[in-house]
Amino acid sequence: MSSNKNTLILEPQDYSNRSISIYKSMGTVFEYNKDFNNHKEIHIIICRLGLFLDMEFLSKFPSLEIIGSSTTSLTHIDEKVIQDRHIRVLSLRDCFEKISNITSTSELTIGLTIDLVRRMSAYSNSVLKDGTWNRDQFKTRQISSMNIGVLGLGRVGSFVAEVFGKFGANVSFFDCNDSIESHLAKSVSKNALLETSDILILCPSWKHGNPIIMGNREFNIIKEGVLLVNTSRAEVIDHDRLVESIKLGKVSGYATDVLPIKYENDNAGSHELVKLYEDGFNIIITPHIGGRTTDAMSYTEDCIADLVLSHYNL
């Protein structure tokens, strides 16, 4: 079934065997490394999140036709370059129905929220690192007595709202698509959500060109002492205002799975949020692991392979 369409897998470690078989049926499959030099032979690039596909990188691939990314976000791809070169990008945005049963990011969001409220990581560190056994070190609350606001009621937001609703929490949501209805949570205005939420969970979809969702205006009206959780994108929030609000106590805790891209990989330690954590503020940061489970990754890699196959009508 070969169509002589050669594929380069940028991050081949533990990649789905089924997906690799599909790409091999179309042509030669290459695995990327620092010594790779077959750029001119590549028609398809398959990526995760480890590399930023900018103009300099993509210019090395004159025959490139498709980029396949097993992600919902495309912030790791220079969208202007691919538009100018008419390169087709296939991502999980193209198979939302297929990924509706994937819960890995929702699970992480729930875990980060509970950790932020109950201070589990901080308590664990006090025992394991400091050797102290002090159950009175932090004042925490029961989630069932709190108001939870979900900003963005898509796949992740809906799952999160359902779980916390079953805890007995008062769950409200705002979505920019005002036609969304849900039995899982009460629909309110964005202002009402910001003003009343004890815990505000950011789950919006976001792409290049969209406005910031948590900016100066939003930080001015959020509830005093709110706990903020972000497993969406770093770009949805004004980090300068976030840091300022944490220092002032307006935001009493922040848990996130994302940082601005310039701080990812080896630069994370220089971000102001890390410094706030070191100063004792309630900060939790994970290195973009929302979808980083073996079963979810294998499934989504196969989804992209099927999309590529369909694109070439094979």
Provide a role label for each language-model segment.
Residues Y123-F159:
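Glycine-rich NAD(P)-binding loop of Rossmann-like domains
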Residues C95, G225, S232-L314:
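Rossmann-like dinucleotide-binding domain for NAD(H)/NADP(H)
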Residues M1-I44, R48, G168, S172:
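N-terminal glycine-/charge-rich "phosphate-binding" loop or analogous flexible N-terminal tail
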Residues L53-M55, N177-S270:
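Rossmann-like adenosine-cofactor binding region
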Residues F61-I66, D84-R88, A169, E224-V226, ...:
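A short helix->loop->beta-strand "cap" motif at the edges of active sites that frequently abuts
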Residues H39-I44, F61-E65, E195-L200, K223-V226:
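Short acidic/histidine-rich motifs immediately flanking catalytic phosphotransfer sites
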Residues H43-S124:
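Phosphate/diphosphate ligand-binding glycine-rich loop within oxidoreductases
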Residues N4, L64, S144-N147, G225:
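Phosphate-coordination loops involved in phosphoryl transfer and adenosine-cofactor binding
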